[in-house]
Amino acid sequence: MALKERIGTVVSDKMDKTVVVAVINRYPHPTYKKIVSRTTRYKAHDPENTCVTGDRVKIRETRPLSAQKRWAIEEILNKTNQAKEVKK
């Protein structure tokens, strides 16, 4: 079975080694055929704390790493210009 991959935007980097990635899914409504957007937020593992809010990233499915974390950062596609603050 192939691992699932998603592309999304980092919306929160306040946790240690974890980021929240928002993935937008677009699909036609079954009855009205209008394109509907649904946003899903995934908690993803970021072992080096390299991602900052606004980065476009690719995440992949992995084994459960915590109660809510089942995704890991595979690569950073677009880096934002924000400087990362030092976490205390």
From Swiss-Prot:
Molecular function terms from GO: rRNA binding; structural constituent of ribosome
Keywords: Ribonucleoprotein, Ribosomal protein, RNA-binding, rRNA-binding
GO CC terms of this entry: cytosolic small ribosomal subunit
Gene3D superfamilies in the cross-refs: Nucleic acid-binding proteins (2.40.50.140)
CDD domains, A to Z: Ribosomal_uS17
Known role: One of the primary rRNA binding proteins, it binds specifically to the 5'-end of 16S ribosomal RNA.
S-S pairs: none
Family: Belongs to the universal ribosomal protein uS17 family.
Domain of life according to the entry: Bacteria
Name the record gives this protein: Small ribosomal subunit protein uS17
InterPro entries: NA-bd_OB-fold (IPR012340), Ribosomal_uS17 (IPR000266), Ribosomal_uS17_bact/chlr (IPR019984), Ribosomal_uS17_CS (IPR019979)
Keyword rRNA-binding: yes
Pfam families linked to this entry: Ribosomal_S17
Subunit: Part of the 30S ribosomal subunit.
Organism: Prochlorococcus marinus (strain MIT 9215)
PANTHER family xref list: 40S RIBOSOMAL PROTEIN S11 FAMILY MEMBER, SMALL RIBOSOMAL SUBUNIT PROTEIN US17M
Alphabetical GO biological process terms: translation
